């Protein structure tokens, strides 16, 4: 039986700041692949908050992690918001995060093994505002990401900006990428020998024509609308990249490296305070 209509049925989410940094975490145990990941995840979440460079809320979606991690998350880290539940997968978790915050929120979405340098969020927001019709901005320049999901960005750049192709990303960043995913350097050099960085200059501002799906910021309502029109958009990383591109949005990455992938073991250099990006 029901009498009347719930007055909050169509109410929008409130209570969050205009900027929200979020991550999806899955740390079920400390065995095998996950043996050293507690340190990785703690470093990721800590640098995400401490190095944002602007006032933002922290929202964590926990996908079935162990109790020890959840105790640390709630008792020590203390995010502004947290969703704790069974492992529903990255796709469902990210879609859920987008719907938790108000539509006009600029939200950062990330995996739980990213490292953040000072002012990562601030720099991404500034880039988003300097270019028109931006769908995503990442702080992690990766050459191989420029193979797909950027047709709209490249077409726009050829018409309204200056587009350059070359090897602009520093070799050390490329080596760091290989280390984080366990790829041999010599193989990587051969595998990517035909790949070029695609750099855009627009009104004096520069960006790469790509946005990495492991870490990016976006306006929540834009991705929610894409998901409404294409229910498969979050089903896979490349599918998401292509869906945002297909919706007519620019996908950009900062020229400086503001974020990077850690992997499942924290390297010695990342244990020091995050003071530099190079």
Language model features: what each stretch is:
Residues 95-106:
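Active-site nucleotide-sugar/metal-binding loop of Leloir-type enzymes
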Residues 121-220:
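Conserved catalytic core of nucleotide-sugar-dependent glycosyltransferases
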Residues 104-115:
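Short beta-strand-to-loop acidic/aromatic patch adjacent to the donor-nucleotide binding site
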Residues 73-88:
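Conserved donor nucleotide-binding strand/loop of the catalytic core
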Residues 1-6, 12-17, 186-278:
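C-terminal catalytic/acceptor-binding lobe
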Residues 33, 66-75:
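Acidic helix N-cap motif at the loop->helix transition within catalytic regions
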Residues 1-47:
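N-proximal low-complexity "stem/linker" segments adjacent to membrane-targeting elements
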Residues 53-54, 59-70:
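A conserved acidic beta->alpha catalytic loop
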């Amino acid at each position: 039986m029901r009498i009347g209509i719930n007055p909050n049925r169509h109410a929008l989410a409130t209570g969050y700041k205009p900027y929200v940094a979020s991550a999806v975490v899955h740390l079920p145990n400390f065995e095998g692949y996950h043996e050293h990941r507690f340190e990785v995840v703690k470093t990721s979440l800590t640098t995400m908050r401490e190095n944002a460079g602007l006032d933002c809320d922290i929202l964590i979606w926990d996908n079935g992690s162990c109790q020890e991690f959840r105790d640390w998350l709630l008792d020590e880290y203390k995010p502004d918001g947290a969703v704790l539940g069974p492992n529903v997968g990255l796709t469902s978790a990210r879609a859920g995060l987008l719907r938790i915050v108000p539509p006009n929120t600029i939200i950062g979405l990330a995996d739980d093994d990213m490292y953040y340098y000072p002012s990562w969020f601030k720099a991404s927001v500034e880039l988003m505002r300097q270019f028109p019709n931006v769908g995503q901005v990442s702080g992690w320049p990766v050459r191989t990401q420029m193979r797909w999901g950027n047709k709209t960005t490249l077409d726009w750049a050829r018409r309204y900006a200056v587009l350059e192709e070359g090897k602009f990303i520093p070799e050390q960043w490329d080596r760091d990428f290989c280390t984080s995913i366990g790829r041999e350097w010599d193989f990587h050099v051969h595998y990517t020998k035909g790949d070029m960085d695609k750099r855009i200059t627009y009104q004096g501002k520069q960006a790469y024509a790509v946005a990495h799906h492991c870490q990016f910021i976006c306006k929540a309502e834009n991705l929610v609308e894409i998901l409404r029109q294409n229910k498969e958009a979050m089903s896979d990383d490349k599918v998401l990249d292509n869906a945002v591109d297909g919706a007519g949005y620019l996908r950009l990455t900062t020229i400086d490296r503001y974020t990077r992938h850690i992997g499942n073991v924290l390297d010695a250099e990342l244990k020091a305070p995050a003071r530099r990006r190079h």
